[in-house]
Amino acid sequence: MAEEVPVINPEEWKPRTKVGQLVKEGKITSMKEIFEKNYPITEPEIVDVLLPKLKYEVMDIKIVQKQTDAGEISKYKVLIVMGNMDGYVSYGTGKAKQLRVAIQKAIKNAKMNIIPVRRGCGSWECTCGEAHSLPFKVYGKAGSVEVLLMPAPKGTGLVVGPALKTLLTYAGIKDAWSLTRGSTYTTENFIKAGYNALYNTYKFVTPVDWMRRK
C-alpha cells in the first residue's frame, strides 16, 4: 500500500554539500538539472525539496541476526520501493532494532538512489506516441537475477512479476513485458535488477538526444 514519503521543512535545512547549497539557494530547481549536470545526490533533503510528492511501499521485511561477543543481535531489514509515478523511481534498504526506524532508514537510502526513467512508445505494434511504456528494450542484472524489460502496446498492462510490477508502477510505466532469469524469488535482487534496467533507459543516448545537444 502506497504511503506518502515524509519530507523536511526547507527552512530548517542546513546544506552540507555544494549541490545542497545550490538547491537551497534556488539555483537548481529540478531533478532534471541534477542529472543533466551529473551532480551526485549526497543529501536526502535535496530530493525532499525537488521531488516533494514521492510515495513508497514496503516490499519485504526480514529479521536478520548478527553474532557478537554478547550473543546474537536481531534486527529488522526493510526493503522499499519509492517513486513519483511520473518518471522517477528508487529503492532502498534499512536495518534497525525497531521496525519504524528501519523503514525510516530505508526511505533515506531510497532518496539517495533516486533515478530518472525515460518513458516512451517503443513497441512496433503501437504508434500512439504517448509515454506509456519503454522507448526500447533495457537489461539489468543484480546477483544471479537478470531482467529484460520490453516495450508493450498501449492497454497491455504490466506483464511482469509482482515485485517488478510495483517498481514499474512507481516509475510511471503502464505497459511492459519482461523476461527474467535466476533466483527471482529473492525480492531485493529482483527489484535491484529491474532498477538497473530502468536506469539504462536514461544512460542510453538516442538520435533525438544528439539533436538536442547540437
From Swiss-Prot:
Keywords linked to the UniProt accession: Ribonucleoprotein, Ribosomal protein, RNA-binding, rRNA-binding
Pfam family name, one: Ribosomal_S5
Residue span(s) of domain S5 DRBM: 54-117
Gene3D superfamilies in UniProt: 3.30.160.20, 3.30.230.10
Disulfide bonds: none
Gene Ontology BP terms: translation
GO terms of molecular function: rRNA binding; structural constituent of ribosome
InterPro entries the UniProt entry points to: Ribosomal_Su5_D2-typ_SF, Ribosomal_uS5, Ribosomal_uS5_arc, Ribosomal_uS5_C, Ribosomal_uS5_euk/arc, Ribosomal_uS5_N, Ribosomal_uS5_N_CS, Ribsml_uS5_D2-typ_fold_subgr
GO cellular component, one term: cytosolic small ribosomal subunit
Domain of life: Archaea
Note on domains (UniProt): The N-terminal domain interacts with the head of the 30S subunit; the C-terminal domain interacts with the body and contacts protein S4. The interaction surface between S4 and S5 is involved in control of translational fidelity.
Role of this protein: With S4 and S12 plays an important role in translational accuracy.
Subunit comment: Part of the 30S ribosomal subunit. Contacts protein S4.
Family per record: Belongs to the universal ribosomal protein uS5 family.
Protein name: Small ribosomal subunit protein uS5
Organism annotation: Sulfurisphaera tokodaii (strain DSM 16993 / JCM 10545 / NBRC 100140 / 7) (Sulfolobus tokodaii)
